[in-house]
């Protein structure tokens, strides 16, 4: 006969904590929920004190998120069964499934909860191997990292009837010309791009290219000189050109 089990629920949304607690009372009356907590740090403290058999762990929580809590538990001596409560997309769910980890998707489904509870009970049998929590956490951590933005490295631009591929390293500055943008390069050539300056700017690395005027975007590395006259007007010298800097963009050169 299986001994009664205990559980802890960690979720920063009070309504969801209590909702899950009520659902567990319905689908698994023998399960004793020993604590409801609202953040990751409270979860770790309560788990250490109460040592529940099961932890229902929301992934996104203040203080420590669910992944950080699970990583700490996975390194410790006491390792409860973890059920992640998640609003993650399908790719993360596949990671759960590959590692045979229990998870509940928000909004909570009673059918899914029943299935999870049955799997937990079955897993108490000594012949069942424990899931590889560490491998799952590594996958989740990778999924949690924001993707690095991909900025333009090469630009397709026209010179006469020909299309050229220009490295952004060779660009001095871009200048808006009605429906086009002209590309001014180190080779003292001017190319045309058929897009607005706003569209182009969204694809450029903001650390390398600054919009200094509504009509101009300059390669910061190409700036040779910054000047300010007695009236407060600022300009930069790029190549052989002197380009005006709008008052709204002068903060970019503070400290220069």
From Swiss-Prot:
Keyword Lyase: no
Entry-linked CDD domains: REC_LytTR_AlgR-like
Keywords attached to this entry: DNA-binding, Phosphoprotein, Transcription, Transcription regulation, Two-component regulatory system
GO biological process terms on file: regulation of DNA-templated transcription
4-aspartylphosphate, modified sites: 58
GO terms for MF: phosphorelay response regulator activity; transcription cis-regulatory region binding
Lineage of source species: Bacteria, Pseudomonadati, Pseudomonadota, Gammaproteobacteria, Vibrionales
Naturally occurring in which organism (per UniProt): Vibrio vulnificus (strain CMCP6)
Keyword presence, DNA-binding: yes
Name recorded for this polypeptide: Uncharacterized response regulatory protein VV2_1193
Disulphide bridges: none
Transmembrane segments: none
Record-annotated HTH LytTR-type domain positions: 155-256
UniProt-listed Pfam families: LytTR (PF04397), Response_reg (PF00072)
InterPro entries assigned: CheY-like_superfamily, LytTR_DNA-bd_dom, Sig_transdc_resp-reg_receiver, WalR-like
SMART domains: LytTR (SM00850), REC (SM00448)
Domain Response regulatory: 6-121
Gene Ontology cellular-component annotations: cytosol; protein-DNA complex
């Amino acid at each position: 006969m299986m001994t009664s089990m205990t559980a802890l629920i960690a979720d920063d949304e009070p309504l969801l904590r209590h909702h899950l607690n009520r659902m567990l009372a319905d689908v698994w009356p023998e399960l004793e929920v020993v604590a409801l907590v609202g953040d990751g740090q409270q979860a770790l403290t309560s788990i250490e004190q109460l040592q529940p058999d099961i932890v229902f762990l929301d992934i996104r929580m203040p203080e420590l998120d669910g992944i950080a809590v699970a990583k700490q538990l996975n390194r410790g001596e006491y390792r409860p069964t973890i059920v992640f409560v998640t609003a993650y997309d399908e790719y993360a769910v596949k990671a759960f499934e590959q590692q045979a980890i229990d998870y509940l998707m928000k909004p909570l489904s009673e059918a899914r909860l029943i299935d999870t509870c049955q799997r937990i009970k079955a897993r108490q049998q000594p012949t069942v191997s424990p899931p590889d929590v560490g491998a799952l956490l590594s996958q989740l951590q990778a999924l949690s990292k924001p993707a690095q933005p991909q900025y333009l490295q090469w630009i397709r631009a026209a010179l006469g009837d020909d299309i050229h591929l220009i490295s952004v390293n060779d660009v001095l500055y871009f200048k808006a010309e009605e429906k086009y943008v002209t590309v001014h390069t180190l080779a003292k050539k001017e190319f045309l791009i058929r897009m607005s300056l706003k569209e182009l700017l969204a694809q450029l690395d903001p650390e390398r290219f600054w919009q200094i005027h509504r009509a101009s975007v300059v390669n910061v590395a190409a700036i040779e000189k910054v000047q300010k006259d007695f009236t407060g007007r600022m300009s930069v010298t790029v190549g052989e050109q002197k380009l005006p800097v709008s008052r709204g963009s002068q903060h970019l050169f503070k400290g220069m």
